Amino acid sequence: MLASYASDPLKSRGRLYKEIPTSYRNEFERDRDRIIHTNAFRRLQYKTQVFINHEGDHYRNRLTHSLEVSTVARSVASTLNLSNDLAETIALAHDLGHTPFGHAGERALNECMREYNGFSHNAQSLKILTLLEKRYAAYNGVNLTWEVLEGIVKHNGPILGEINEYIAEYNKQNDLELSTYASAEAQIAALADDISYISHDLEDSIGAKIIDFHSLAELKYIDQHVVELKSKFKNISSSCLIYEVVRKLIHELITDLLWQTKENLNKEKITNIDEIRNLNYQIVDFTEKTNKNIKETKKFLHERVYKSNKITAISLKCTKIVQGLFKVYMDDINLLPVNWKMLIDSNETYSKARVVADYIAGMTDRFAIQEYNQLCSTSYITCF
């Protein structure tokens, strides 16, 4: 049974375009299925998480990451008697707006768009789901419920100060109450993302030999699991060791998140969802100690993995590809597919730049490489 402060699909604020409910799915399940059926969701399987897709079959990509986030989000929401369908749906959609080549691609595209209000993957997720996906005759986008769109836009907290152009534009027709916190389910999806990416980026980085178990000594709360497992299983293999460490880490983080969130709910005597939205802090959270550990882990990953020689070398090539594609399309808009070219308002530079950015952002790693080789490169790129 759902808690009184859960997002109840029977009490959803509905969709921008009215639709008749189905008898065999609730509204959030329906949204989940719509997201899974989008082209943007399928393309995630060929978009970088940390390692380029072709570097190894077992490294995570944006799709496998999103699936892992969704399982954590669903488990946490269920335990707290919240809507696991809503938490899962927001988690599945949270990375739809990412560019090819991970954060390197996003930084490069944001730099290209500096004169045109920049690029934000979060806003791009909203744009994909409300405009760019063309699956219905009656409207653009996939017409998701208010709660799912709110969660996608605000899962990292209220949007204050300068608001992204597309979010502001969309908000005029469908007010997402940007200055308040999102539902508890959306907050869960955001922290499930943290749990998944720090755990699995550590796993993939050890698999890629960018870091080793000795370097994990810098993270005492993780190293204690390494020491304990080596003591208990004398002949444990390195591959099995990292799986066990990650399993224990995920369990530890979820348990901590559940404990602190229950404490917050009891302390605030929360009885309805509006009380969650109107708090001055997020109700779903880790303990102070765990937040500190997570912050240290993110710093460790940034310095030891994302800035490593291997990742930096790849990132430079990815940046070159994204910037090269942006320039060549801006110089000759006729290189865009006809259906994309039709989206440009006359020959106005700003509109042209936004359409080019939307097109590049939707590319997979391999398609971006293919386009670059065909349109820009004098030296053929096959892999990094």
Curated annotation (Swiss-Prot):
One of the GO biological process terms: dGTP catabolic process
Highest taxon, organism lineage: Bacteria
Annotated ranges, domain HD: 62-198
Record's keyword terms, sorted: Hydrolase
UniProt entry tagged with the keyword Lipid metabolism: no
UniProt GO molecular function: dGTPase activity
Hydrolase is among the record's keywords: yes
Family matches, as CDD domains: HDc
PROSITE patterns attached to this UniProt entry: HD
Gene3D superfamilies noted in UniProt: Hypothetical protein af1432
Family: Belongs to the dGTPase family. Type 2 subfamily.
Protein name (record): Deoxyguanosinetriphosphate triphosphohydrolase-like protein
Species for this entry: Rickettsia africae (strain ESF-5)
